[in-house]
Regions:
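Cys/His-coordinated zinc-binding microdomains
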Residues: 3
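Alpha-helical lid/collar subdomain of P-loop NTPases
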Residues: 51-92, 100, 273-278, 282-397
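DNA-binding alpha-helical recognition surfaces that contact promoter or target DNA
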Residues: 11-15, 128, 326
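C-terminal recognition-helix end and immediately following basic linker
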Residues: 6-33
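Short, surface-exposed acidic
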Residues: 21-26, 33-36, 288-299
Length: 397
């Protein structure tokens, strides 16, 4: 068209002629747009390269916690539990060991009782395993007033009269999950959260389901149905079945020993080490990390100090991952609303947890544990020259 030569004409056509490659080829269908030298070079570099089809979906495997495990690619993700936000498997401390043993039980399909302090990641572990491995699962939460029978079936009526209608849990136990494409039938994972809040009668519904000989479930009218082989019952709780022993989980009940005995594995979860928790927190609160990165070091040292004291029964409190997120979350809320980072930012964030202490004595003990790690300190309140309390509005919040 103009005699210009280059390895590729696309840029020249756009800059000099305001024309796209498609428009150029419409006018000159047989014209070359890439130099033959370039085509020859690409052909030479691609010699010996073999293309292969992706693996068959039913034969997908992955490495997880040191184990080679199968991924059910033909299971709809919506049939699995959702992946927790920014979840990562820990690699330090007691919790890393706890998860390793829990993973063995999970992967082998054992009925599992997981207990531990609030915020130690009990439910999150099951959610992550279900989501990553495409294991169909449903979750139920126990409260003292829950009608667990309604999880299985309910009485219904219409113009033709009354009848029993089976519910999601009953169908999961007796029918399993049918993969939409392959039509394979897979057993469900049934996650029951806060199981130690169950009353004696509520807990009884699991007795037949986790029977060591053959799982069964009682249907309407007393008829007994077989549970799909491989169905896995996992429950989470704050206590190990003996009720509240610390005075902090007052709604926890004692669980019948024969029911506890039917759980094939019992695993205790501990709190996460800060080395594992820090990258999760930075991912959850990116604005705070961008504007005040040193705050994570202060909160991290405070976290380690508090949890050590709680583990020794020196502090009558809990400091879970939820508490850490509450602290950091309030700090991020502040930096989002302010142009300059307040000097007492970490202290103000700590208040959202400290104000939840059961009494002044416990609050002061917690303040003393973290005061040395927070630059502005957390004990006492600054006052201006008039003696009035100096709050955030005085700093132009």
């Amino acid at each position: 068209m103009c005699g210009f030569q280059d390895y590729f004409l696309g840029d020249h056509l756009a800059e000099a002629h305001d024309m796209s490659l498609d428009a150029y080829l419409e006018s000159f269908p047989k014209a070359a747009t890439v130099a033959q030298e370039v085509l020859d070079s690409l052909a030479e570099r691609s010699k010996g390269i073999q293309r292969s089809h992706p693996p068959v979906p039913t034969e997908l495997y992955t490495e997880l916690l040191g184990f080679k495990v199968r991924v059910n690619a033909d299971v709809d993700p919506l049939a699995c539990l959702p992946m927790p936000h920014e979840y990562r498997f820990p690699s330090h401390g007691d919790l890393a060991v706890d998860l390793q043993e829990a993973a063995v039980s999970f992967l082998r399909g054992r009925h599992l009782y997981i207990h531990g302090m609030p915020g130690s990641g009990k439910d999150a572990f099951v959610h992550a395993m279900s989501a990553l491995l495409r294991r169909p699962a449903i979750i139920k939460t126990v409260t003292p007033t829950t009608d667990v029978e309604a999880w299985l079936y309910v009485r219904s009526f219409d113009q033709e009269g009354t009848r029993w209608e089976t519910q999601e849990l009953f169908r999961a136990l007796t029918e399993g999950y049918t993969c939409p494409n392959s039509k394979r039938v897979l057993p469900y994972i049934i996650l029951i959260s806060d199981f130690d809040r169950a009353t004696k009668s509520q807990a009884e519904f699991l007795r037949l389901i986790i029977d060591s000989i053959s799982g069964r479930v009682q249907g309407p009218g007393g008829k007994v149905f077989s549970v799909v082989p491989g169905t896995q019952i996992i429950v989470t709780a704050n206590t190990s079945g003996g009720g509240d022993v610390r005075g902090r989980m007052v709604s926890a009940n004692v669980i019948d020993g024969s029911i506890m005995d039917r759980f094939e594995r019992k695993i205790q979860f501990h709190w996460m080490e800060w080395d594992d928790e820090e990258p999760i927190c930075k991912a959850k609160f990116p604005i705070l990390f961008e504007r005040c990165p040193d705050s994570f070091r202060q909160v991290g040292k405070s976290t380690t100090s508090l949890r050590s004291s709680i583990a020794k029964d020196e502090l009558y409190a809990e400091f879970s991952h939820r508490a850490v997120c509450s602290w950091l979350g309030h700090m991020e809320d502040i930096v989002v609303l302010t142009k300059e980072v307040p000097k007492d930012l970490v202290k103000r964030g700590a208040r959202t947890w400290l104000d939840g202490m059961p009494d002044e004595e416990t609050r002061l003990a917690a303040q003393k544990l973290i005061d040395a790690y927070v630059k502005s300190g957390v004990i006492g309140t600054e006052r201006d020259s008039s003696g009035d309390r100096k709050g955030p509005l005085a700093e132009g919040f």
